[in-house]
UniProtKB/Swiss-Prot annotation:
Membrane-related topology note: Multi-pass membrane protein
Pfam family, one: ATP-synt_A
Keyword vocabulary terms for this entry: ATP synthesis, Cell inner membrane, Cell membrane, CF(0), Hydrogen ion transport, Ion transport, Membrane, Transmembrane, Transmembrane helix, Transport
Lineage of the organism: Bacteria, Pseudomonadati, Pseudomonadota, Alphaproteobacteria, Rhodobacterales
Database matches in PANTHER family: ATP SYNTHASE SUBUNIT A
Chief location category: membrane
GO MF, one annotated term: proton-transporting ATP synthase activity, rotational mechanism
Name used for this protein in its record: ATP synthase subunit a
Gene: atpB
SUPFAM superfamilies xref list: F1F0 ATP synthase subunit A
Subcellular location: Cell inner membrane
PROSITE patterns: ATPASE_A
Its job: Key component of the proton channel; it plays a direct role in the translocation of protons across the membrane.
Family classification: Belongs to the ATPase A chain family.
Transmembrane spans: 36-56, 91-111, 121-141, 147-167, 196-216, 220-240
Length: 248
């Protein structure tokens, strides 16, 4: 939280919680088991447990796990159908998995002394690049060269179309960057603010205010954890729609 400096003051280290460390000591290399890998594993286990337990017993009066699983299933199914149409439902399993992984990783990251994989650009950029590569390949496979019409704004004045095409191409290739930074940045910011409040809790005079701040921020972070997973998923659906229907 906060360490004592040589002069007697407190030094806050809100970014220390995001450091990637080796689980068994030593330097971090390509194949070193790290805290990131551990908590991504926990997130996958949480998703599997929730969906398996939630779908194992389909009772008339659903259990909590069944209610959560059915709610998540219906929520994402409707999102995919509304944005991408019936044709996009074949990608529902992938989008559902993506949403559940992100939301579970975000929620597990709210546990004290845990680690949040989605606060790292290295993790979120892989998720975003997977979406980008998938929709780009799908766009060309389904539409051929007609997919390039996505970048040609036919409704604009003829003189502006080449300029707008360049802007559209740049914005298309920036998608994975903005897609990943939005998620990692928001998650990191919230956790850093909580850590700062936790540091101030060590000061007697302001500790009551700091504790109230931590409580309020935790409540906000629960909401942000869901919203960021929702935003990432809905943007994935929008990009998928562009690949399926580039003319719309």
């Amino acid at each position: 939280m906060a360490d004592k400096a040589e002069g007697g003051g407190l030094v806050f280290k809100p970014m220390e919680q995001f450091e990637i460390t080796a689980l068994f000591g030593g330097d971090v290399t390509w194949y070193t088991p790290t805290n990131t890998a551990l908590w991504m594993g926990f997130s996958i286990i949480a998703v599997v447990l929730l969906l398996v337990v939630g779908s194992s017993k389909r009772a008339v009066v659903p259990s909590r796990a069944q209610s959560v699983a059915e709610l998540a299933y219906g929520f994402i199914y409707k999102m995919v159908e509304d944005i991408c149409g019936k044709e996009g439902l074949k990608f529902f399993p992938y989008i559902m998995t993506l949403f559940m992984f992100i939301v579970c990783a975000n929620f597990l990251g709210l546990i004290p002394s845990s680690f949040t994989p989605t606060s790292h650009f290295a993790v979120t950029v892989v998720l975003a690049l997977a979406v980008f590569v998938t929709v780009t390949i799908l766009g060309f496979v389904k539409n051929g060269t007609a997919f390039l019409s996505l970048f040609w704004v036919s409704s604009a004045p003829l003189a502006l179309r080449p300029v707008l095409a360049i802007i559209e191409i740049i914005s298309y290739f920036v998608r994975p960057v903005s897609h990943s930074i939005r998620l990692a940045g928001n998650v990191m910011a919230g956790h850093a603010v909580i850590k700062v409040f936790a540091g101030f809790a060590a000061l007697t005079l302001v500790s009551p205010v700091a504790i109230l701040g931590i409580t309020a921020m935790y409540g906000l972070e629960v909401l942000v954890s869901f919203i960021q997973a929702y935003v990432f998923t809905i943007l994935t659906c929008v990009y998928l729609k562009d690949a399926l229907h580039p003319h719309h």
